[in-house]
Design a protein with these regions (language model features):
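Bacterial Sec-dependent N-terminal signal peptides
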Residues: 1-23
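Histidine-rich, glycine-flanked metal-binding segment
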Residues: 25-27, 34, 38-80
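Conserved beta-strand scaffold positions in the cores of enzyme catalytic domains, especially
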Residues: 28, 69-73, 145-147, 414, ...
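C-terminal cap of metal-dependent C-N hydrolases
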Residues: 32, 371, 375, 391-428
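Divalent-metal coordination cores built from histidine and acidic residues
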Residues: 74, 78-88, 100-229, 245-246, ...
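Histidine/acidic-residue-rich catalytic or RNA/ligand-binding cores of hydrolases
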Residues: 94-98, 128, 236-245, 258-264, ...
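His/Asp/Glu-enriched, well-ordered alpha-helical/loop segment
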Residues: 315-400
Length: 429
């Protein structure tokens, strides 16, 4: 048995920072306090044994290990599952703002912050396939990337975002971004989406309830999950839930289950709690349905918060977003953590808003960004929990996140698929 100081295990010098990734055949983490969906209070003095990227054993205390084992004594630090951002956009415009250099920098920052998995909710599938491959085999420092194939009505493909994401191809005619109608060969469209490497079908705009049902039924036959924008102009949120989508995105859009148009008075109301508490209609029936179907709400509070801060006309969006999310949480709806942000802030900020603005406990915010986000991507059998057989996607924290959700940022090291990553501050010249 060899005890290795962490500083000797991990080293790769870079100009501004030192960074490292190291994947031993057998990795042992000792003296950790486990926090995950199955451990609502820290389980102390645990040893985690990782082999070939998977957790193979969890036990109390320390025992004898082979000389080939790399052992890291974490001295009572806190261990959580790797964080999962269930809503990012990394390749909307690969020729512009999402150029490779910028994207690689963002992905690296995400991983070092503790994010080990992301779900990209529509972009250039050609670029995303390459990034996902490189992330998976460790050729880039990045969370694992799972991405969607978008399907929407033809009118949506005049949107300039879709034109940027299909540059060089046919807008609405790409396997990963396709216009569909009642006459579309849905079986072929889904087979093409799977062939593009997508992990799920995202339904976006201008789709009827009948067409949503056709897509979901065929997707089930071909064993690929469906993720929905929560309102599709034709199909209401409850239609998408009834059809069998496993997650729906954007809390404010749930209001369209009760109304076709937002009242003008909402856009002038401002942040006053009395107005919103009195005027927000009940969504209890929808929440009951979502709970029964175990449909996960991808609330995306952060993006609405940022809109409200920069545009007073968007204040209403955030006022209903946080209330709907809070009511859904109180009703037992599963909620994941996705940002839908401009990549300046990560899922840790979404977690903070769930606590400060939607009434979550820090524990439930952690579950949202781990187990529930894994479920939203259809990965909960391999990611999002600390258990035997799960991927070794883990974050070591120096402070207890159950005491303060901001402690989620006290990252000491990150493990993704058994690879150990740590950021070191550069020495002064």
């Amino acid at each position: 048995m060899k005890l290795h100081p962490l500083c000797l295990l991990l080293f790769v010098a870079l100009p501004l920072f030192s960074a490292a990734q190291y994947r031993p055949h057998l990795l042992v983490l000792t003296d950790v306090n486990i926090i995950d969906a199955g451990h609502p209070a820290p389980t102390a003095h645990q040893t985690i044994i990782i082999k070939e990227g998977r957790i193979v054993k969890i036990q109390s205390g320390i025992t004898t290990f082979p000389d080939s084992a790399v052992i890291i004594n974490l001295k009572g630090r806190y261990l959580i599952p790797g964080l999962i951002d269930s809503h990012v956009h990394m390749a909307t415009d690969p020729s512009g703002t999402d150029n490779r250099s910028h994207t690689l920098q963002v992905l690296q920052e995400m991983l070092y912050s503790g994010i080990t998995t992301v779900r990209d909710m529509a972009g250039d599938g050609r670029v995303l396939a390459g990034l996902a491959r490189d992330a998976n085999i460790g050729e880039i420092v990045s969370p694992d990337i799972y991405y969607s194939a978008l399907m929407a009505g033809p009118s949506f493909f005049s949107d300039p975002r879709t034109q940027a994401s299909t540059k060089g191809g046919v807008g609405g005619g790409m396997p990963y971004m396709k216009a569909i109608t009642d006459t579309t060969n849905i079986a072929l469209a889904i087979a093409q989406a799977i062939g593009s490497g997508a992990s799920g079908i995202k339904l976006y705009a201008d789709l009827s309830a009948d067409l949503v049902m056709k897509v979901v039924n065929e997707a089930k036959k071909q064993n690929i999950p469906v993720w929905g924008h929560a309102w599709l102009q034709g199909a209401k949120p409850s239609d998408i839930v009834k059809a069998g989508a496993i997650s729906i995105s954007h809390a404010p859009l749930l209001i369209y289950d009760k109304m076709n148009k937002v009242p003008d008075s909402w856009k002038k109301a401002g942040p006053g709690a009395d107005f919103w508490d009195k005027n927000l209609p009940s969504l209890d029936e929808l929440f009951i349905l979502m709970k029964q179907r175990r449909t996960i709400l991808d609330a995306t509070l952060l993006t609405y918060k940022k809109w409200a801060m920069t545009d007073t006309a968007m204040q209403w969006d955030y006022q209903i977003a946080k209330r709907i999310t809070s009511h859904a949480y109180a009703s037992g709806v599963l909620i994941c953590a996705g940002t839908d942000d401009d990549q300046e802030q990560f899922v840790q900020e979404e977690m903070r808003l769930l606590v400060t603005d939607a009434g979550f406990s820090p524990f439930d915010a952690i579950v949202a960004a781990t187990k529930n986000s894994a479920g939203a991507i259809n990965l909960d059998s391999t990611k999002g929990s600390i258990a035997v057989g799960m991927d070794a996607d883990l974050v070591v924290l120096t402070r207890n996140p159950l005491e303060n959700i901001d402690n989620i940022k006290s990252v000491d090291l990150v493990i993704k698929g058994g690879r150990v990553y740590q950021h070191f501050a550069a020495s002064a010249p």
